[in-house]
Curated annotation (Swiss-Prot):
The protein's enzyme class: transferase
Gene that this sequence comes from: rsmA
A GO CC term assigned to this protein in UniProt: cytosol
Subcellular location: Cytoplasm
Species annotation: Afipia carboxidovorans (strain ATCC 49405 / DSM 1227 / KCTC 32145 / OM5) (Oligotropha carboxidovorans)
E.C. code: 2.1.1.182
Database matches in SMART domains: rADc (SM00650)
Classification via HAMAP family: 16SrRNA_methyltr_A
Annotated NCBIfam families: ksgA
Role this protein plays: Specifically dimethylates two adjacent adenosines (A1518 and A1519) in the loop of a conserved hairpin near the 3'-end of 16S rRNA in the 30S particle. May play a critical role in biogenesis of 30S subunits.
A GO molecular function held by the record: 16S rRNA (adenine(1518)-N(6)/adenine(1519)-N(6))-dimethyltransferase activity
Reaction(s) catalysed (UniProt annotation): adenosine(1518)/adenosine(1519) in 16S rRNA + 4 S-adenosyl-L-methionine = N(6)-dimethyladenosine(1518)/N(6)-dimethyladenosine(1519) in 16S rRNA + 4 S-adenosyl-L-homocysteine + 4 H(+)
Record-given protein name: Ribosomal RNA small subunit methyltransferase A
InterPro entries cross-referenced by the UniProt entry: KsgA/Erm (IPR001737), rRNA_Ade_diMease-like_C (IPR023165), rRNA_Ade_Mease_Trfase_CS (IPR020596), rRNA_Ade_methylase_Trfase_N (IPR020598), rRNA_adenine_dimethylase (IPR011530), SAM-dependent_MTases_sf (IPR029063)
S-S bridge residues: none
Length: 282
């Protein structure tokens, strides 16, 4: 695929606007239009969907989303150098691209959505990717304002997102992600597809929010998983002491063997312990 629209090639856009990637902003630009189109398609039909894109840079994925038929794209970009390039795309797709010059970590899109169907699709800046994902997974109330996320991460982070009990990568992020969403790694992207090429493989992950996750206080769940995984090699009867209650009694009340280690406990087990923690502290 040489072009998806009649706008200039991305390499020309980079030169025109002096948009060479900055490591300080976690930027790795994806120039391959086959791949940007594949990411856009992974988000499903978009003709009645508003897409939130974080860190669009020169706009390769932005163009793919619009060309694929997204009703509207709200692009949040911190790098002021990218704004003129994005404005050029907005002129090509009048009324369909809204550009927000700001910090994605503090951006709340809900006032702009007005009840519209929304999805988050992004090649996330690697230096804030986990922070952003954790924030989206922590939205209250749940289900959230978005019905899907299709996001690119470093492969190691992607493995942590989809991990479940007894997986080597299983940890706090995997518990939160799979408690609140169905997760799947869709495909990998090699370093050579990016400019500059990162040192590791990247992966595109889909997260579909669960309509009714197991009933639990998110804060209590975070407390339990933090205690358990901060000392992941220790048995729960040791690691859960940080919670300020009898750890063995907590685990047993939740139906979890207190001699188990965090990496072997299911999400349902952590939810049960979080619920018992609230009762014990009441």
């Amino acid at each position: 695929m040489s072009q998806i629209d009649d706008l200039p090639p991305l390499r020309e856009v980079i030169r025109k606007y002096d948009l060479f990637a900055r490591k300080s902003l976690g930027q790795n630009f994806l120039f391959d239009l086959n791949l940007t189109a594949r990411i856009a398609r992974a988000a499903g039909p978009l003709d009645d969907v508003t897409v939130i894109e974080i860190g669009p840079g020169p706009g390769g994925l932005t163009r793919a989303l619009l060309a694929t038929g997204a009703k509207r794209v709200i692009a949040v970009e911190r790098d002021e150098r990218a704004i003129p390039a994005l404005e050029e795309i907005a002129r090509r797709y009048p009324g369909r691209l809204e550009i927000i010059h700001g910090d994605a970590t503090t951006f709340d899109p809900t006032p702009l959505l007005q009840g519209e169907r929304a999805r988050i699709v992004a090649n996330l800046p690697y230096n804030i990717a986990t922070l952003l994902l954790t924030g989206w997974l922590s939205v209250e109330p749940w289900p959230p304002w978005f019905d899907m996320m299709v996001l690119m991460f470093q492969r190691e982070v992607a493995e942590r997102i989809v991990a479940t009990e007894n997986d080597e990568a299983y940890g706090r992020l995997g518990v939160l992600a799979n408690w609140r969403a169905e997760t799947k790694i869709l495909f990998d992207i090699a370093p050579g597809a990016f400019v500059p090429p990162p040192k590791v493989m990247s992966s595109v992950v889909r997260l579909a929010p669960r309509a009714a996750p197991l009933a639990c206080s998110r804060r209590a769940l975070e407390q339990v998983t933090a205690a358990a995984f901060n000392q992941r090699r220790k048995m729960l009867r040791q690691s859960l002491k940080a919670l300020g209650v009898d750890p063995a009694a907590l685990a047993e009340a939740a139906g979890v063997d207190p001699t188990r280690r965090a990496e072997t406990v299911s999400i349902a087990g952590f939810v049960a312990m979080a619920n018992r923690l609230i009762e014990l502290k009441a």
